[in-house]
Structure formats: C-alpha cells, structure tokens
Amino acid sequence: MLKIRNLYKSFGKVEVLKGVDLDVVEGEILVIVGPSGGGKTTLLRSINCLERCEAGSIVINGKELFKDGHYASKKELTAIRKDIGLVFQGFNLFPHRTVLENIIEAPTRVLGKTKKEATESALEILGFLGLTDKANNYPFELSGGQKQRAAIGRALAMDPKLMCFDEPTSALDPSLTDDVANVIKSLSTQGMAMLIITHDMDFAKKVADRIVSMNNGIILEQHIYEVAEND
C-alpha cells in the first residue's frame, strides 16, 4: 500500500528527512516511534501531501505520488489522495457540525455521493465505532475518546486504502486508549493498511504488527522488530 524510497525533505537549511525507506503492506499496522524532532510527523505529512519533498519517491496503492522532485498532476494527486485517510492529533472536527454532518461532508463534496448515500454509509461507520447514539451530537458534547472515534469515522467515510494516524492517543486519558486500539485492530482485519506515529510505547505494542524507530531523519533499521503478540 505504501512504498517510500530514499526520501529527502528540508526546511531551509535544516534537513529533516535524510533518505527514508519504508514499506507498509495491505492489512499491516506499522507504528513509527522515536523522539520529538526526529522526522516522524514530517514523514506522515509528506505522505499526505501536506509537505513537499525534494528527492526520492512515494508510491501509494501502486500509484506514483512523487518521484525525483516531481509530483503527480493535480488530477492524479486528487485520485491518489482518495486512497489516504489522515486522523489528526487534535481531531480537527468541525465544531459547528454534528458528528453525522462531520462524516458526510467529504463524501458529498469530494466523492460526489448524494446526501442519502453518504448518510447511510456514515450510519454504518458510526455503528462500527459504537457512536450511533452520538450521531446528532456536536463535538463539544463528546468525550476525548468519542472525538477520536468520530475523527476516525470521518476518515473512514472516504474509504481509504491507507490510514495514517498522528499521535492518536496523545489527547486521551490512558483509560481510553484501549478503545482506540480496538478500533484500529478491527480495521486491519478488513485489509486496511495503517501507519501510526506515537510516543506511547504501550499503545504501540497493543496495536502494531511492526514497530520502527525513527530519529534524526532516518529509519533506524537495527531497531525494527516484529511484535510477537498484541497484548
């Protein structure tokens, strides 16, 4: 689902990504851990076209997003980005819209679904996430864990092939992380590939098929290991 080769990204004279190689396969949950400033979030943002890289390549679901300083055309980028879901660290839900309205916004505007089609799909997603009774609530009426699940639901509504999570438990009480972990593991059983950035090693061990350590703009291959059990 994701293939990155020799990826470089700089901010001015500061080199943040220094030749990153990374693969994520269908149904895999890959977690990237490492200290702040090591390049994890920049890598995630680069995959989602929120940052532009200078060299290397990014291929998503067999489609070339970026190669050797050149990005796909605007039309191609739009198609590729439909395969990527992103759940932000701060949820980024629209505060003036209900949970249901948050979820149907992108499918109607971007995918061209009718409101009826988008609503039917959204209600299925809310059922899967255990949020059916919160469909008409506004974000301020939700707990942190419920907001995170609603944010996941909004990303799922676009039917992505690769889901990216930026620190999905950082704003949650530790007692709520199991809820998010269970949702993520359920998604992987449906074949969705996931890339997760986190500082929470306990959470990483609960969800990951593979954990990669990243620091100083590079993947530390000697720290890659397979998780034998998801406790």
PLM regions: where:
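H-loop/switch region of ABC-family ATPase nucleotide-binding domains
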Residues: 198-199
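Helix-to-loop junction immediately C-terminal to a conserved catalytic motif
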Residues: 48
